[in-house]
Amino acid sequence: MSFVKFEKQGNVAVLTIDRPEALNALNSQVLCDLDAAISQVEADDEVRVVVLTGAGRSFVAGADIGEMVNFSAIDGKKFGVHGGSIFLRLENLSKPVIAAINGFALGGGCELAMACDIRIASEKAKFGQPEVGLGITPGFGGTQRLPRIVGISKAMELILTAKVIGAAEAKEIGLVSQVYAPEELMDKALELANAICANAPIAVSESKRCIRMGMQTDIATGSAFEAEAFGVCFGTEDQTEGMSAFLEKRAEKHFQNK
């Protein structure tokens, strides 16, 4: 039995963290199942966009405290490296990932959402990095991604106070881009995913890569990445199709991921 469900809807893969009795808390097995799902998505040429969500009333309530409570320092580091490396794989996936945050996104759950490319949330969603209240630091990238997304001052406030915020404040600080009624969330996530799918897959993938790489370097180096990606696209059949459709005033496009 896998704790991460994989479902395809056209060119969209929907991954659901499915451990609702534990509010989808991340233990070692859930992390391994997520890693396997990422590999499945990467290998499937039909998948162009991923939507990640949680079963029940939680996105991911955090790492599993029941598993962590008796960790040694060595165990803790190994668990952090394990989760952190999987989240980095998700972040570096060639296909865009949309987090549809349906409920609690705390600790490791907030970190998982931040590893996604686009975050949208239910009005009932809750966000936070409450680890210092448990005597630990964020362990799956929270100290690195949160300040990059919301700025250093706000990240310090959220992490050092262990404050939990609602969806409206998460949107206000830029942690999520949109907030929807709970019953609308998945429809809106799929609508967004399909809007991305309508574009040239190689161009979408290269654009994601440039943004991600650019966030880690200076503008000059990032611009060099962009120029390389720009050139790569001119060697694709999809560039020919896209520009031909524009010149021919043709609304329908047939992108082949080539």
Where are these regions (language model features)?
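Conserved CoA-thioester-binding segment of acyl-CoA-metabolizing enzymes
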Residues: 1-55, 88
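Amphipathic alpha-helical segments at domain termini/boundaries
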Residues: 1-14, 18, 163-195, 205-214, ...
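Glycine- (often His-adjacent) and acidic-residue-rich active-site loop
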Residues: 3-5, 32, 46, 54-89, ...
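Terminal peptide-recognition signature
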Residues: 15, 19, 34, 52, ...
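Acidic-histidine catalytic/liganding microenvironments
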Residues: 20, 44, 93-94, 236, ...
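Charged catalytic carboxylate motif
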Residues: 29-33, 82, 89, 188, ...
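Crotonase-fold acyl-CoA enzyme core
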Residues: 91-202, 235-236, 241-244
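Helix-loop "lid/cap" segments that line or gate small-molecule binding pockets
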Residues: 158-159, 210, 214, 229-234
